[in-house]
Swiss-Prot record, chain B:
It comes from Pongo pygmaeus. GO terms for cellular component: blood microparticle; haptoglobin-hemoglobin complex; hemoglobin complex. PANTHER family: HEMOGLOBIN FAMILY MEMBER, HEMOGLOBIN SUBUNIT EPSILON. Belongs to the globin family. Heterotetramer of two alpha chains and two epsilon chains in early embryonic hemoglobin Gower-2; two zeta chains and two epsilon chains in early embryonic hemoglobin Gower-1. This is Hemoglobin subunit epsilon.
Length: 142, 147
């Protein structure tokens, strides 16, 4: 599965807007994930997961920054996220189903913040893009 | 059986009361067909589904979307009794329509995203969680009679 030129253009242009709210988007995405899918909290027993916690904010920023890296290297997501892919495969070992859950919560966040931009076409492009990112992050699992 | 708290029921019913079910239904089904094109497999008789604008403007998509979302309204009136409420529809989707229950999850998530576009800030993480619980429970109820 690879992104068309149109899809890449949609992602890159929306990212310009998204990046101005990157940190809050990251934090809120994680909040949404933990509230809607509480089982995902099992990966963070060492975190204070109360809304607004410093750890949540830091981790949210990290996650969104990684998405940003993928956007900036949208022609070579595999290369851009290679180290992160190894981290998830050998250290974190997050079950692959959770990437869909996180992706969905990010999409909900984007839809709520940028409703005019989040057309059906943009929704499709973002869903596909995050699906590619998820594949890259799980491709070394076995 | 899934139990919804008073807060969860309030989160669901308050947004539902503000929705234009007819429009939202068309949007939800349309987005499903755009974002997950393989779901078009169930709708060969719908005519032109060749592009996002064709899909979203397609009158059959709008009509069917309205039907689907109106039925979802029954779920909201019967949140404590979803399996019974959807027993007949479940049999229909299995025996006559042959729909993989995975599609119920896809549609549920598309609906959540549409709610987010309509309600913005009001669609808080807590409100989303209530809706995720509902769409998941409806998906399970619709799959319950599969055999």
């Amino acid at each position: 599965m690879s992104l068309t030129k149109t899809e890449r253009t949609i992602i890159v242009s929306m990212w310009a807007k998204i990046s101005t709210q990157a940190d809050t988007i990251g934090t809120e995405t994680l909040e949404r994930l933990f509230l809607s899918h509480p089982q995902t909290k099992t990966y963070f027993p060492h975190f204070d997961l109360h809304p607004g916690s410093a750890q949540l904010r830091a981790h949210g920023s990290k996650v969104v920054a990684a998405v940003g890296d993928a956007v900036k290297s949208i022609d070579n997501i595999g290369g851009a996220l290679s180290k992160l892919s190894e981290l998830h495969a050998y250290i974190l070992r997050v079950d692959p189903v959770n990437f869909k859950l996180l992706s969905h919560c990010l999409l909900v966040n984007l839809a709520a913040r940028f409703p005019a931009d989040f057309t059906a076409e943009a929704h499709a492009a973002w869903d596909k893009f995050l699906s590619v990112v998820s594949s890259v992050l799980t491709e070394k699992y076995r | 059986m899934v139990h919804f708290t008073a807060e969860e029921k309030a989160a669901v019913t308050s947004l539902w009361s503000k929705m234009n079910v007819e429009e939202a239904g068309g949007e939800a089904l349309g987005r499903l067909l755009v974002v997950y094109p393989w779901t078009q497999r169930f709708f060969d008789s719908f005519g032109n589904l060749s592009s996002p604008s064709a899909i979203l403007g397609n009158p059959k998509v709008k009509a069917h979307g309205k039907k689907v979302l109106t039925s979802f309204g029954d779920a909201i009136k019967n949140m404590d009794n979803l399996k019974t409420t959807f027993a007949k529809l479940s049999e229909l989707h299995c025996d006559k329509l042959h729909v993989d229950p995975e599609n119920f999850k896809l549609l549920g998530n598309v609906m959540v995203i549409i709610l987010a576009t309509h309600f913005g800030k009001e669609f808080t993480p807590e409100v989303q969680a209530a809706w995720q619980k509902l769409v998941s429970a409806v998906a399970i109820a619709l799959a319950h009679k599969y055999h």
